[in-house]
């Protein structure tokens, strides 16, 4: 597993060595841990689900955010327009808070507002069952390991690379197709796995 920490030197070392780090929200917003059990018990999305990305403790210059509906996407768009961030706010029209490749996806960024389909990335639309995450946390972990080990299905790899590609294109200010290709190269060459192993 990955060690969660809010120690600045540990996190800087992770970025220097692996190129990534994990910011586990409860460590940075301790008051939120008191709210977590209530949120779980309610079983519905709350204001706190919406607030999370806006209170990122690292104040990133580049940010990709997935949202669960178009109304929230529009609200985030208005809020992010008031910042100097490079941002992409994503909502798949079939309900995912990420790029699913199961249909069209709307992206609002500081560059544009676009609707795109899998074909824009040169891949085919997929079925929801092709990206099913399993029934348990263990199932999901096995799928993740297979993908990062280069043993994912084409559908799994494409969805991972579509999302990573948008994050890359947001930070590098390149088009999504170029970001997708960079993500695919990183995944299939094993570079993504090497970064994870260094964490």
Regions found by a protein language model. Give the residues of each.
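Mg2+-dependent prenyl diphosphate-binding active-site environment of isoprenoid biosynthetic enzymes
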Residues: 8
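Glycine-rich anion-binding loops and their surrounding alpha/beta cores
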Residues: 1-5, 13-199
